[in-house]
Amino acid sequence: MIQKQHESKLEVGQTFPVTIKRLGINGEGVGYFKRQVVFIPGALPGEEVVAETTKIQRGFAEAKVKKVRKASPHRVKAPCPVYEECGGCQLQHLDYKEQLNQKRDIVVQAFEKYMKNSMEEKIRPTLGMENPWHYRNKSQLQVGRKDEKVITGLYKQNSHQLIDIAHCMIQHKATNEATKVVRRILEKLNVSIYNEKKQKGLVRTIVTRTAVQTGEVQVTLITTKEELPNKEQFIAEVQKQMPAVKSIMQNVNWRKTSVIFGDKTFKLAGKEVIQETLGDLSFELSARAFFQLNPEQTVVLYNEAKKAAALTGNEKIVDAYCGVGTIGLWLANDAAEVRGMDVIPEAIADARKNAKRHGFTNTKYEAGKAEQWLPKWVKEGWRPDVIVVDPPRTGCDDKLLETILKVKPKQVVYVSCNPSSLARDVQALMKSYEVEYVQPVDMFPHTAHVENVVKLTLK
């Protein structure tokens, strides 16, 4: 019997038939072979495929599709020529309407893992985009040479091979154009290009960002040292070939690292920042400032957060993990007061600046953790009616969840970028809170990511 069990386990290189049951959290197909769970990128729910094992991990196996025996009716041809090599998108081969259904299903599965009772009826259909292409406002592409030509792209997963991306289908047309212009000029001026294997050369990365509403573009060159040969010519060419570029910056990163930005950033030409607007708010974006990557869907997400908060104008709001203050400022007009906190002091400085620029007098921002500030404010007699959390992928700190359960605001609005940590945290809050609904929002079409807004009300 022991022998038989051992034989049924998969081995690397083995081919086997499998039916795909669902999509995993990273967009891969999930199937079972002799009760062993197998993750297969590129396979879709309902498909029958022949797969080949690529890796055996503890408790699961990874495999690749060798042949699709029975294709999903929702399978489409990915329009991007480097889709399978690049790895930036995971779901271009799935019809967009079905992507939205599957993203909801990923959320349903995440909650099933943590909850005794089904949450399915509380999880709403995913809010998608009318045009799910060319939505990203920022591009960071590595620079290399191939057959003496300057290329820009991303490294193939787990390799040093740079995939040339001439036109990214999820990047805004202005960022694609700016990257193309810069790489053409670098080639024309014969500027030294960084070689990742030899770790020699000057220009490592081209970062381009567009302010979608104003049309302003910012270009940042990441280099290994400060000296930039033909600097004046480079600036003149960029400005001539693409007048929308209002800010040309340089950042120096000499470290052997995959982290893109180094510590030193300075202006080469134009302005330090570009102007972007989001609804009624305007923002100044410096080269390193955080800003949501899909402004169109950010408005949808923030409006959902506002709906969930159900404000009457009298509420005191806490914006935990506030960053540069975007969500809190989105709510401030409809609230009595917004208090935000973040552990990054620079973000708090930006939040204060943003609030001041918009003339808000009912906001207050502090550097530090919510679990430190909240008890202090409650002690001083200031108790929030609504707490909004928008944590990183890892979810809320346990201490913050404990603090929320002690402070007991009437509403908690949870904005999440990871269904798994969301479901775990919501389960912890259900000691005192009722889930009204979960609203998935598709911020990143053609990828496996899904954001959510959850409305929780005190029992």
From Swiss-Prot:
Its EC number is 2.1.1.-. The active site is at C417 (nucleophile). One of its GO terms (biological process) is rRNA base methylation. The keyword Disulfide bond does not apply. Coiled coil: none annotated. Gene3D superfamilies: 2.40.50.1070, Nucleic acid-binding proteins, Vaccinia Virus protein VP39. Keywords: 4Fe-4S, Iron, Iron-sulfur, Metal-binding, Methyltransferase, S-adenosyl-L-methionine, Transferase. PROSITE patterns: SAM_MT_RNA_M5U, TRAM, TRMA_1, TRMA_2. It comes from the Bacteria. InterPro entries: MeTrfase_TrmA_AS, MeTrfase_TrmA_CS, NA-bd_OB-fold, SAM-dependent_MTases_sf, TRAM_dom, U5_MeTrfase_fam. The keyword Transferase applies. [4Fe-4S] cluster binds at C80, C86, C89, C168. S-adenosyl-L-methionine binds at Q292, Y321, D342, D390. One of its GO terms (molecular function) is rRNA (uridine-C5-)-methyltransferase activity. Residues 9-67 form the TRAM domain. Belongs to the class I-like SAM-binding methyltransferase superfamily. RNA M5U methyltransferase family. This is Uncharacterized RNA methyltransferase BA_0426/GBAA_0426/BAS0414. It comes from Bacillus anthracis.
